[in-house]
Amino acid sequence: MKIKRTITSLLTAAMLATALAGCQNTSEASKVQSANDEQNSQATVTETTAPPDPYSDIDDMISKMTVEEKVGQLFYVNCRGNDMSDAINKYHIGGVLLFGVDFDGKTKEKVNADIKAMQSNAKIPLIIGTDEEGGTVVRASDNPKLRESAYLSPSETFANGGWSAVEDDAYDKAEFLLSLGVNVNMAPVCDITSDSNSFMYYRSFSSDAASTSRFVDTVVKASKEKKLGTVLKHFPGYGDNGDTHYSDATDSRTFSELQNNDFLPFQAGIAAGADSILVSHITVNSIDSENPASLSEPVHKVIRDTLKFDGVVMTDDLDMFAVDALDIYEPLSVVAFKAGNDFLCCGDIESEYTALLNAVQSGEITADRIDESVKRILIWKRNLAIL
């Protein structure tokens, strides 16, 4: 009987211990499950809560714009000494490109007053740009009333003082242009050429992709720090090919050659935070043998999909020979916009604006496509602290 009671007691104790362990395990499992549920709940909240849109106010602004105002923002109009008040008021243009004649013989005060008058006529602040590359292309600095001497070419600047001189030059240009009221420099030149007979030879920094890339990176970063807009030009790179100002030009290099050489300075500029890319009028057979780059949808797909650039893409001047002389049935502004450009550089604003507006109103170009480009342009203006 004593043995039996002992065994019974042992069995009872074992069963009690098992029950208690089971309760403890259940309690621990409940805690783990509760923690998992809380984590899942937090994860669900994280996944479903979208970050705030930093440009929601720009979307709101676009929603209140008329179609005429939206179309106008897509145009970057050559000034060339003309009175721009009508273009600004009537066509709601997005920007004005100044040439040498717009600075020649003028004091800083006069240039400031001219640009201030343009801005006062604009409902939305204007991009005011000019080409101040240095060397053979200077618009403002060769006026002794504005600067003691014109800027040297970037390659000369480097030869005189190395990379620190290039950086100092970029800072100085930014301060100089901003002091005049200019907010965008149509630079840096990203083209690489080794042919001394090429029209780009004295404008390009180097025949070496790595050096040119470092130059572009330096200029973009310095300009960005000062809030001067930059434009990477002339995509996809002229190389040693002809001048599209006066004739058509064709590039027969392979896509791989372009990727491994000419694209590199553009990629450096994009990584540095460049605002815009200008597309040239050269025909690049390896991408699109039928159309100049500026009017080519495949070329613009390379910019967006291969280079991953989401800033403003602009045309080179649509008045240049290589596109102006084309035998096409559609207005250049419509063709260029359909190809993927956001900002259309031209002189004949009346006809090009009217053609693009008609294409939008007829449904040939969608409202969403217009809004997409207008948003890029307004974001650019916001980043330059003019909007």
List where the protein language model places each region.
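Second-shell residues forming the walls of enzyme active-site clefts
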Residues: 66, 96, 104-118, 126, ...
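Bacterial N-terminal signal peptides that target proteins for export
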Residues: 1-11
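Short, acidic/polar
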Residues: 78-90, 165-176, 259-268, 327-335
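N-terminal hydrophobic targeting/anchoring segments and the immediately downstream early-domain regions
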Residues: 35-128, 132-142
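C-terminal motif of bacterial Sec signal peptides marking the signal peptidase cleavage site
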Residues: 18-22
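A substrate-binding/cap region within the structured catalytic cores of diverse enzymes
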Residues: 150-220
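Bacterial signal peptide processing site
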Residues: 24-26
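Short glycine-enriched loops at secondary-structure junctions
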Residues: 79-83, 130-143, 183-193, 232-238
